[in-house]
Curated annotation (Swiss-Prot):
Cofactor(s) named in the record: Mg(2+); pyridoxal 5'-phosphate
Swiss-Prot/TrEMBL keywords: Decarboxylase, Lyase, Magnesium, Metal-binding, Polyamine biosynthesis, Pyridoxal phosphate, Spermidine biosynthesis
PTM annotation (N6-(pyridoxal phosphate)lysine): residues: K101
Metal-binding in keyword set: yes
EC number(s) from the headed UniProt entry: 4.1.1.19
Organism this protein belongs to: Shewanella frigidimarina (strain NCIMB 400)
Catalyzed chemical reaction(s): L-arginine + H(+) = agmatine + CO2
Protein name, as recorded: Biosynthetic arginine decarboxylase
Keyword Metal-binding: yes
Length: 636
């Protein structure tokens, strides 16, 4: 296609919309990163960046973090709420709380906290949902506002640690998830001589729509019913501790795509707040939880992978609803808290790796079957003649369907011994030739052709074998059908010659990416430049900064990848600040209680038994290097 342009590539991969300006495609067809949208000219090619890392000794795959994106996401969300507060004359402020479960990596949490260094009044706190997370935030929250929100189920130790946080100078809100926690908090607070800051997680009747909708609604795993909330109020009153109740919390679920769901949830929770205030509770914080979505596919829709609103609309709806409710009930406006971890972290990380090989269909010439060949093969030859233009007596779709029926029959006949292996091979090649010809004759403009086009794109797609583990690096793609943008990092200045699917290197048929952003929709294959064994072919998996690292598993003992922190300096040049080596083979063996030291002893015994003396040292050295090596492919 001579009329192909970079704009075609940008729209074809929908980069403009899912990237939020952080990623783009340069005129030379290279994918770029621009971590500070305020300096849009500061763009660095990811292909060049990856090559420089490889030259510096960093093996692929590598997870590349751009901390400036984290800073920008914090600032943009706070700015959206600050603007909404001014717009509606809201009489309180906003606090962004980062739930570290989204990404607990030290560099990520520290960079999010570092976004507050220049702030006179920090607008950032931290959230913990377990004892290990609580221990982490107790040591880090002082770098921002020192506000800590404690969610999740709690035992006595968790509660005591949270209360000790108050002694350390933090403001620790212990959010009650179930009735039994209240008694434990009051007992341990008295023992420690601390007045607790309590929060209530209310269980809303309203349930938003999405993959995580079970987080809300009456059957939610977490939260207190209306009756339980009133019981907590009564118990606090009888203990003369009602003033300790300072926060109301609810959570509709992660990735809420429809702004109306958010508005409705805030409205219901807001009435809880106002009525509890009327009952004498001193609640002054309104925690909307998570739910702020990320537009993974860039369609700006209500799909599970998208969102039909922007940051300003999100903030405006929350502030507007609360303003109206507080005015209606004549109650003070509470501090607004949101726990928007996915929004902060998703864009900041990209997994870059290499294609190690492909399996591609190439049309081969077929010869007319012999006169004594099975009639089925003659039927298939006739279909081939018709579709190849030598005859034109039937509709394209009819010929295609007949060919599919014929190949199915061929497989059945082979299975019962009525078709030879050579005949089966001929039938398969004839079917592929028909499919190839049919695809070239179909039109996207004909709606009757579109289902067949989709079917053929999948059937004829190249298989790209990619040096990564889906289960380790993109577990949500496997577990919940999450869509992540995937792009070749170069060659996009030319029209894509092929369509492909990405397969990982695990020994598992589920190790395949089966959904791709393609224009304004999702497809089962990805348009790509053709692969060549003569030059490196790099692939980027984008928006993997939220949840993927901590959820990733070690299927086939593929471990953590290498990771790097990269900044773009004031000159627009990339600076690799740090590299964290991924797991070695010995590391992952240790994880499953296999000892590399014991293995070396065993290897030595076997070498002494079976290898001639002059080869023993080199064999042992290779075995030792194998234990010290990267779990991913390095030589291919």
């Amino acid at each position: 296609m001579s009329d192909w342009s970079i704009e075609d590539a940008r729209s074809g991969y929908n980069v403009t919309h899912w990237s939020q300006g952080f990623y783009g495609i340069r005129e030379d067809g290279e994918v770029t990163v621009s971590p500070n949208p305020q300096n849009p000219d500061h763009k660095v090619g990811l292909n060049e960046l990856a090559k420089s890392m490889v030259e510096a000794g960093v093996s692929l795959p590598v997870l590349v973090r751009f901390p400036q994106i984290l800073h920008h996401r914090v600032e943009s969300l706070c700015e959206a709420f600050n603007d909404a507060i001014k717009k509606y004359d809201y009489q309180n402020d906003y606090l962004l709380v980062y739930p570290i479960k989204v990404n607990q990596q030290k560099t990520v949490v520290e960079e999010i906290l570092a976004s507050q260094k220049s702030k006179e009044v920090p607008q950032l706190g931290l959230e913990a949902g377990s004892k290990p997370e609580l221990m982490a935030v107790l040591a880090m929250a002082q770098k921002a506002s020192s506000v800590i929100v404690c969610n999740g189920y709690k035992d006595k130790e968790y509660i005591r640690l949270a209360l000790i946080g108050e002694k350390l100078g933090h403001k620790v809100y212990i959010v009650l998830e179930k009735m039994s926690e209240l008694k434990m908090v009051l007992i341990e607070a008295e023992k420690l001589g601390i007045t607790p800051r309590l929060g209530l997680r209310v269980r809303l009747a309203f349930q938003g729509k999405g993959k995580w909708q079970a987080s809300g609604g009456e059957k939610s795993k977490f939260g207190l019913s209306a009756a339980q909330v009133l019981k907590v109020i009564a118990e606090l009153k009888s203990a003369n501790m009602l003033d300790s109740l300072q926060l109301l919390h609810f959570h509709l679920g992660s990735q809420i795509a429809n702004i109306r769901d958010i508005r409705q949830g805030v409205s219901e929770a807001g009435r809880f707040y106002c009525e509890l205030r009327q009952l004498g509770a001193s609640i002054d914080c309104f925690d909307v939880g998570g739910g702020l979505a990320v537009d993974y596919d860039g369609t700006r829709s209500q799909s599970n992978n998208s969102m039909n609103y922007g940051l300003n609309e999100y903030a405006n709806n929350i502030v507007n609803v609360l303003t109206d409710l507080c005015n209606e009930y004549e109650q003070p406006m509470p501090r607004i808290i949101s726990e928007s971890g996915r929004h902060l972290t998703a864009h900041h990380a990209v997994l870059i790796t290499d294609v190690i090989g492909t399996e591609a269909y190439q049309p081969e010439n077929i010869q007319e079957p012999s006169e004594d060949a099975p009639q089925l093969l003659h039927n298939m030859w006739q279909s081939w003649l018709e579709i190849s233009g030598r005859y034109d007596q039937r509709a394209i779709i009819e010929i295609y369907h007949d060919s599919q029926s014929d190949i199915s029959e061929a497989h059945s006949l082979f299975a019962v011994g009525q078709l030879s292996l050579a005949d089966r091979a001929w039938a398969e090649q004839a079917n592929l030739r028909v499919c190839h010809e049919v695809k070239g004759l179909l039109s996207n403009n004909n709606r009757y052709h579109r289902p067949v086009i989709d079917e053929l794109n999948e059937k004829l797609a190249d298989k790209f074998f990619v040096n990564f583990s889906l289960f380790q690096s993109l577990p949500d793609a496997w577990g919940i059908d999450q869509v992540f943008p995937v792009l070749p990092l170069s060659g996009l200045d030319k029209a894509p010659e092929r369509r492909a699917v990405m397969l990982d290197i695990t020994c598992d048929s589920d190790g395949i990416v089966d959904q791709y952003v393609d224009g304004q929709g999702i497809e089962t294959t990805l348009p790509v430049p053709a692969w060549s064994a003569d030059s490196p072919y790099l692939i980027g998996f984008f928006m993997v900064g939220a949840y993927q690292e901590i959820l990733g598993d070690m299927h086939n003992l593929f471990g953590d990848t290498n990771s790097a922190v990269v900044r773009i300096d004031e000159r627009g040049l990339s600076q690799i600040e740090s590299v964290l080596e991924g797991d070695t083979v010995a590391d992952v063996l240790r994880y499953v209680n296999l000892d590399a030291v014991d293995f070396m002893r065993t290897y030595e015994e076997l070498v002494n038994q079976h290898i001639v003396e002059e080869e023993r040292a080199s064999i042992l050295e290779e075995l030792q290097l194998g234990l010290k090596g990267y779990t991913y492919l390095e030589d291919f």
